[in-house]
Regions:
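A glycine- and charged-residue-rich anion-binding loop/surface
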Residues: 1-246
Length: 246
């Protein structure tokens, strides 16, 4: 039976007792499976957690083809195949990812609401996050207007509402874009702003501020796309508009 994924119900737990139920490999590296886990695997645009399982450093968390959650560990010898171990999540990394992910949804909704510009792709990274939106042309004042709208939502600290649904009822929610998952689906509502199928959102958005750097950086077309970057919390982004790609 696949691991019970406790992070869906509680994304703020940082320490727990993990029971090892299987030892194996993922992508050729040693890995363990836990009966229940709060470690978040790489999925839904959010990076995997880091931390520790017992004395072993957690290097990665991935979902296998069989839907089992594999915790890739750094081990130089045999791994104990059973037993309970103290587990700890790298909270600084996790919380940063949660902020980045929530901020991306709010900023994407701002582009769509104000400019009718859908998000074509998004990449969340350790240093910065990037969203790519479909716009043929834009000026700095327009970008500032989008940024101001997104920050207004953050400062108002609208209470998130969580909804659980499934494939049969997902159509009842006005999602900004179709979910990438199936089965049991978690939908997060930012009141009067956005509905998204998400992973681990933050409880409060008032401690988050979005800064954008903007410029055409066309990865799929000579001139039709632009990018906006969400920087780390509390940091302003000073950058120049890059030149058009050839």
């Amino acid at each position: 039976m696949p691991s019970e994924r406790r992070y869906y119900d509680d994304s703020y737990t940082t320490r727990f007792s993990g029971e090892v139920v299987a030892v194996g490999e993922h992508a050729g590296k040693p890995a363990v499976e836990l009966a229940s886990t709060w470690f978040y695997p790489e999925s839904g645009g959010q990076l995997a957690d880091r931390g520790a399982i017992g004395t072993l450093a957690l290097a990665d968390v991935q979902v296998g083809d069989d839907d089992r959650v594999w915790h890739v560990v750094e081990a130089s010898g045999p791994i104990q195949a059973s037993g309970s171990f103290a587990c700890e999540i790298d909270w600084a990394r996790r919380f940063d990812h949660m902020q980045q992910h929530t901020g991306q949804h709010i900023l994407s909704a701002a582009f769509e609401r104000l400019l009718d510009a859908p998000t074509l792709s998004s990449t969340l990274g350790a240093e910065r996050s990037v969203i790519e939106v479909g716009l043929a042309d834009v000026d700095w004042r327009t970008v500032e207007r989008v940024e101001e709208a997104a920050n207004r939502v953050l400062w108002e600290d609208r209470a998130l509402r969580l909804h659980w649904t499934d494939d049969a009822h997902i159509g009842e929610f006005p999602l900004r874009k179709p979910p990438k998952v199936s089965g049991r689906i978690r939908v997060v509502e930012v009141p009067d702003w956005d509905w998204s199928a998400v992973t681990t959102p933050v409880k409060s958005r008032s401690s988050r501020r979005l800064s954008t750097c903007w410029g055409p950086n066309c990865s799929r077309s000579p001139y039709c796309l632009s990018r906006a970057c969400i920087t780390s919390p509390f940091l302003n982004c000073a950058c120049q508009t890059p030149a058009l790609s050839p």
